[in-house]
C-alpha cells in the first residue's frame, strides 16, 4: 500500500518539471550540472571508498614491516607462527612443519605467542 503511494509520489515529482516546463524557450545544453554531479560522485568515492582503503593498506604495510619472530599470522587461511623473516618471505611454523610464504600474502597479524 505505502510502496504504491511512495512510487506514485516519486513518479509525479519526476514528471513535474516536464508538466510545468516552458515549451516556448529552446533547451540549452549545459555543461555545469553534469560536471557538478560528476565532481560530487568523485568526492564521494574518494572519502567513502578510496581514502579508508588507503589508510587500511598503509596501516597493514606498517604492521608487516614490524613483524617479529614469534608473531602469529594468517596467510591464505593458514595460521602459523613466524620462525624466520627474510627480505620478501617469511618461514611459518605450522602443525606439521614449516612453510615459506610471501610477506604480501599475510592477511592478518594476530597477537604474538609468549
From Swiss-Prot:
Ordered alphabetically, the record's keywords are:
Cell inner membrane, Cell membrane, Membrane, Protein transport, Translocation, Transmembrane, Transmembrane helix, Transport
Membrane topology, from the record: Single-pass membrane protein
Q: Which domain of life is it from?
A: Bacteria
Q: Which GO terms describe its cellular component?
A: plasma membrane
Q: Which Pfam families match?
A: YajC
Keyword Transport carried by entry:
yes
Mention one GO biological process in which this protein takes part, according to its record.
Answer: protein transport
UniProt-annotated location(s): Cell inner membrane
Which InterPro entries does the UniProt entry name for this protein? Answer: Preprotein_translocase_YajC
Has the keyword Zinc been applied to this entry? Answer: no
Q: For this UniProt entry, which segments traverse the membrane?
A: 30-50
Q: Which family does it belong to?
A: Belongs to the YajC family.
Q: Which PANTHER family match?
A: SEC TRANSLOCON ACCESSORY COMPLEX SUBUNIT YAJC
Stored NCBIfam families: yajC (TIGR00739)
Quaternary structure, from the entry: Part of the SecDF-YidC-YajC translocase complex. The SecDF-YidC-YajC translocase forms a supercomplex with SecYEG, called the holo-translocon (HTL).
What does the UniProt function comment say about this protein?
The SecYEG-SecDF-YajC-YidC holo-translocon (HTL) protein secretase/insertase is a supercomplex required for protein secretion, insertion of proteins into membranes, and assembly of membrane protein complexes. While the SecYEG complex is essential for assembly of a number of proteins and complexes, the SecDF-YajC-YidC subcomplex facilitates these functions.
Entry protein name: Sec translocon accessory complex subunit YajC
What is the taxonomic lineage of the source species? Bacteria, Pseudomonadati, Chlamydiota, Chlamydiia, Chlamydiales
Amino acid at each position: 500500500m505505502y510502496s504504491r503511494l511512495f512510487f506514485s509520489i516519486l513518479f509525479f515529482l519526476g514528471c513535474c518539471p516536464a508538466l510545468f516546463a516552458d515549451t516556448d524557450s529552446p533547451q540549452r545544453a549545459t555543461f555545469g550540472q553534469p560536471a557538478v554531479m560528476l565532481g560530487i560522485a568523485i568526492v564521494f568515492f574518494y572519502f567513502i571508498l578510496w581514502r579508508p582503503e588507503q589508510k587500511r593498506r598503509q596501516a597493514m604495510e606498517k604492521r608487516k614491516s614490524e613483524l617479529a619472530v614469534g608473531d602469529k599470522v594468517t596467510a591464505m587461511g593458514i595460521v602459523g607462527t613466524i620462525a624466520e623473516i627474510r627480505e620478501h618471505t617469511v618461514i611459518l611454523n605450522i602443525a606439521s612443519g614449516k612453510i615459506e610464504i610471501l610477506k604480501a600474502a599475510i592477511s592478518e597479524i594476530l597477537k604474538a605467542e609468549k
